[in-house]
Curated annotation (Swiss-Prot):
UniProt cross-references to InterPro entries, sorted A to Z: AAA+_ATPase, ATP-synt_VA_C, ATP_synth_F1_bsu, ATPase_a/bsu_AS, ATPase_alpha/beta_chains, ATPase_F1/V1/A1_a/bsu_N, ATPase_F1/V1/A1_a/bsu_N_sf, ATPase_F1/V1/A1_a/bsu_nucl-bd
NCBIfam families linked to this entry: atpD (TIGR01039)
Function: Produces ATP from ADP in the presence of a proton gradient across the membrane. The catalytic sites are hosted primarily by the beta subunits.
Similarity field: Belongs to the ATPase alpha/beta chains family.
Record-given protein name: ATP synthase subunit beta
Gene name in the database record: atpD
Positions bound to ATP: G158, G159, A160, G161, V162, G163, K164, T165
Keyword Nucleotide-binding: yes
Major subcellular location class: membrane
């Protein structure tokens, strides 16, 4: 057994000295337990650390995976001889776990035959899959303008309070329930309350037995928040590689992974780079993102919420994330202020598969038509603000009227937000979405007031509302 001693504790970073020639490699897990000590400890200690740096003179610097309260210099530290390993496979389904794969749902231990280290190489290039297929979400604005790639990576970008988590919850509700496959949810540095709500919602919906939930919330040390995404990903990889499944991986929030990396980096004494972020930002992000991929055996489709500090998309954290994604859904505060939810910016959001060869000519033309009308409306807004609507040409007046209808038709009531909106959620198939927007662009509904388009599901619902409005008049 390889045993070292604590020589220094700085917050969540612990320096440990080992005997010459017995220094553990980077990423190895170390344990500090009360029962291993020569003298009894005041509080029971069961702490896991991960080696992050070799300092020379047989010393390593390790990052703690829980609170370092009660540690004193001279304590014995045991090298486990391997990286942090977590249980994977069928016994983990339906469980709520922490970064070390330990259950936190009070349902007893996880009995699994398979354990994987959380640090694993990405699949080699020749094993990666290149097929392109659309993943239907039932959310109109996403299916039309930002179609999701099956087995791809999707990012939801937005500042504080514009609805990232609500969209993630709705996607879990729509895709995980329809999908029937396995879903993994990694809660990285977000609110414990949201995790609790999600757990109970999944339980009530009866999809918990096909879901794994891994949490490292806001109150956890940065080491946990930095590694909990890898724990969730490792569990998803098992089902992709060993069982050939199509797995859904939800990460809320990937920015907290970067933020935790920045905290750890400062504690390790690295020189900060732009805006105070860690110099290894792109490397850390790449190591995580390159593992989230589809192979010939199975796929991982990931949906990642990305917090945008101060609504600045050029901040290094969201900017680094952009490079890895197939679809970027940008949530806009201006659209949220209009009361249009989901507050997706139809002109700023992009998808790699909005291509006539993949989604079809009709879908492509309708999507581009919607964007054209909304772009023209955006250009005309300054003129309207200064001179008023009367100064516009008849053609522009028609564009403005249609754009306002399109804008409202892009809103949709969500099942997970029923308690707040009082409206039942709507799932709209892609075909219905395309038909609805095509009819608005063709001018078939120019006579319907724009209020009828707000928070509607299909175009038939809009027409029905207009009839009711006429009847009551």
């Amino acid at each position: 057994m390889n045993v070292g001693r604590v020589v220094q504790v700085i917050g969540v970073v612990v320096d440990v000295e080992f005997e010459p020639g017995k220094v553990p490699p980077i990423y190895n897990a170390l344990k500090i337990r009360s029962e291993d000590q020569d003298t009894p400890t005041e509080v029971p200690i069961n702490l896991t650390l991960e080696v992050a740096q070799h300092l020379g003179n047989n010393r390593v610097r390790a990052v703690a995976m829980s609170s370092t309260d009660g540690l004193v210099r001279g304590m014995k530290v045991v090298d486990t001889g391997a990286p942090i390993t977590v249980p994977v496979g069928r016994p983990v389904l339906g469980r709520l776990l922490n970064v070390l794969g330990e259950p936190i749902d009070g349902k007893g231990p996880v009995e699994s035959d398979h354990y994987y280290p959380i640090h694993r190489p990405a699949p080699p290039l020749e094993e990666q899959s290149t097929r392109a297929e659309i993943l239907e979400t039932g959310i109109k604005v996403i299916d039309l303008l930002v179609p999701f790639l099956k087995g791809g990576k999707i990012g939801l970008f937005g500042g504080a309070g514009v609805g990232k988590t609500v969209i993630v919850m709705e996607l879990i509700n729509n895709i995980a329930k329809q999908h029937g496959g396995i879903s993994v949810f990694a809660g990285v540095g977000e609110r414990t309350r949201e995790g609790n709500d999600l757990y109970h919602e999944m339980k009530e919906a009866g999809v918990l037995d096909k879901t794994i939930m891994v949490f490292g919330q806001m109150n956890e040390p940065p080491g946990v928040r930095l590694r909990v995404g890898l724990t969730g990903l490792t569990m998803a990889e098992y089902f992709r590689d060993e069982e050939g499944q199509d797995v859904l991986l939800f990460i809320d929030n990937i920015f907290r992974f970067t933020q935790a990396g920045s905290e750890v980096s400062a504690l390790l004494g690295r020189m900060p780079s732009a805006v105070g972020y860690q110099p290894t930002l792109a490397t850390e992000m790449g190591q995580l993102q390159e593992r989230i991929t589809s192979t010939r055996k199975g796929s991982i489709t990931s949906v990642q919420a990305v917090y945008v500090p101060a609504d600045d998309l050029t901040d290094p954290a969201p900017a680094t994330t952009f490079a890895h994604l197939d679809a970027t859904v940008v949530l806009s505060r201006q659209i949220a202020e209009l009361g249009i939810y989901p507050a997706v910016d139809p002109l700023d959001s992009t998808s790699r598969i909005l291509d006539p060869h993949i989604v079809g000519e009709e879908h492509y033309q309708v999507a581009r038509g919607v964007q054209r009308v909304l772009q023209r409306y955006k250009e005309l807004q300054d003129i309207i603000a200064i001179l008023g609507m009367d100064e516009l040409s008849d053609e522009d007046k028609l564009i403005v009227a249609r754009a306002r209808k399109l804008q409202r038709f892009l809103s949709q009531p969500f099942t997970v937000a029923e308690a707040f909106t009082g409206r039942p959620g709507k799932y709209v198939p892609v075909k219905e979405t395309i038909r609805g927007f095509k009819e608005i662009l063709e001018g078939k509904h120019d006579d319907i007031p724009e209020t009828c388009f707000y928070m509607a599901g299909t175009i038939d619902e809009v027409v029905e509302r207009a009839r009711e409005l006429e009847g009551s008049a």
